[in-house]
């Protein structure tokens, strides 16, 4: 996340750049492990040091999301926030921002936990899948759906059946 693996900037810096125009940099919180906190500030000096949080105990994504929710709520109890992994390779930043804008609008209308699905292009066994449920509505010109179910990393035959069904998406982890 702190190296320029894809492109000229560190992946974390690219993640922050993608949000330009949607989320002001002063509203960005980073949850990282304690050992990497200083390196994060070195790679992204525009960040508020008080909003770069070293996890007291490294756990999993759910624990980091919970910590982020508590910290954001302290600043603004009505805030809507997103969890974005720093290691995602995203070529369509504008498309991501449009999707996030729709998710934010849906969450503001009816407090929900939103997740992003990626159109599956092959039967991948290394990704979790999201099965699309009923339409909730249109928000910011995009349809938003309920999640019917989550499936963790299926075998190849099951992944192929999901691709054939047409209502399963790769779980973006966002």
Where are these regions (language model features)?
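Conserved beta-strand scaffold positions in the cores of enzyme catalytic domains, especially
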Residues: 2, 52, 113-115
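Residue-level marker of positions within ordered structural domains that often coincide
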Residues: 1, 7, 73, 135, ...
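Conserved core of the sugar-phosphate nucleotidyltransferase
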Residues: 93-174
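Conserved N-terminal catalytic core of the sugar/cofactor nucleotidyltransferase
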Residues: 4-85, 91-92, 101
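Residue-identity detector for glutamine
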Residues: 1, 14, 36, 78, ...
């Amino acid at each position: 996340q702190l190296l320029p693996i894809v492109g000229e900037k560190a992946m974390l810096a690219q993640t922050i750049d993608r949000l330009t125009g949607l989320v002001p940099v002063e509203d960005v919180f980073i949850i990282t492990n304690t050992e990497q906190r200083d390196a994060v500030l070195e790679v992204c000096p525009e960040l508020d040091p008080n909003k770069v949080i070293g996890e007291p105990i490294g756990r999993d994504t759910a624990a980091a999301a919970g910590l982020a929710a508590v910290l954001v709520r302290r600043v603004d109890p009505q805030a809507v926030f997103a969890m974005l992994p720093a290691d995602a390779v995203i070529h369509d930043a504008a498309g991501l921002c449009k999707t996030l804008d729709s998710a934010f609008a849906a969450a503001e209308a009816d407090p929900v936990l939103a997740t992003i699905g990626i159109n599956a292009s092959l039967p991948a066994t290394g990704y979790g899948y999201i099965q699309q449920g009923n339409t909730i509505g249109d928000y910011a010109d995009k349809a938003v759906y309920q999640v019917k179910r989550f499936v963790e990393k299926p075998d190849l035959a099951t992944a192929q059946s999901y691709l054939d069904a047409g209502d399963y998406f790769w779980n973006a982890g966002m």
